Amino acid sequence: MMSTIYRHLSTARPALTKYATNAAVKSTTASSEASTLGALQYALSLDEPSHSWTKSQLKEIYHTPLLELTHAAQLQHRKWHDPTKVQLCTLMNIKSGGCSEDCKYCAQSSRNDTGLKAEKMVKVDEVIKEAEEAKRNGSTRFCLGAAWRDMKGRKSAMKRIQEMVTKVNDMGLETCVTLGMVDQDQAKQLKDAGLTAYNHNIDTSREHYSKVITTRTYDDRLQTIKNVQESGIKACTGGILGLGESEDDHIGFIYTLSNMSPHPESLPINRLVAIKGTPMAEELADPKSKKLQFDEILRTIATARIVMPKAIIRLAAGRYTMKETEQFVCFMAGCNSIFTGKKMLTTMCNGWDEDKAMLAKWGLQPMEAFKYDRS
């Protein structure tokens, strides 16, 4: 089978964009191609990413024998990315706690008894200080997170965040913020400030979503992503693995992302850190609950890399729970970004020195800011 993959890689088929412009005809042609080749070989043969994946195609790829799947993902990664580069991101919590949402996993929800108190938003000078430290340590994207449901009625906060974004950009760092739901006007304000990317995760599959969150719909999340992309900001959207979901939910999660047009610029993969006092931690304490296996993480990453080849795939929260060998295999499966520094909002994060040593051992170097456009 691998010889077939190599053969199709060397004789890549015409890009989908060269087919008929009618969307229905494109979809039919793509389905025919995939049927002839098999989903994995079809994905590897494309000159441009497809945005019309079916769940059956994704399931076929996801359940490819693991060694073959990982190898295919590495082939795809090397086809679309510089395999020696890794994007280093640092995240700062600029407004902690007090969120009105009921996300079962989150320490910052006011509905969860985690002992985390709501705090006011930090000052601009504090952000600049943290961004300078991140830059000294090699990070090229600086991310700001605030525990809010949305930005309604937060005009003064928006002005301060715009100032933060502009000043961090002036330091030569890319900027990303996660502020909850934003409308088109708010997205435009962030774009005008120079924002590089906006993070808004879909968390899981549409089918599993309501078992985790009820105060914000799946379509609410998709609308925010649409608002962001239409404003000209890159979308950073991924999810959390380990929420009691099934492997079909991993496939459904990838299905949503891979059918976006354009695909997310970056795709963070979080491994759940079960926090005491959250409903999710209580559910997972049940011996009968569904526990996430490492091979499921690997399959999710590899499948995402194969069907969203241009995206930056980022190991995010929970990476500190992985052994170095596990992280290494994730990079072999297509990861090319990490969060590094002091903290991931309310959970631990691998430190800069630790990560520098690990990446140097692997022969990886930081991506330069503003010079890695895969759109």
Swiss-Prot record:
Keyword set includes Mitochondrion? yes
Residues that bind [4Fe-4S] cluster: 99, 103, 106
> Which GO cellular component term is one of those annotated?
mitochondrion
Protein name listed in UniProt: Biotin synthase, mitochondrial
Q: Which NCBIfam families match?
A: bioB
**Pathway stated in the Swiss-Prot or TrEMBL entry:** Cofactor biosynthesis; biotin biosynthesis; biotin from 7,8-diaminononanoate: step 2/2
User: Which class of enzymes does this protein belong to?
Assistant: transferase
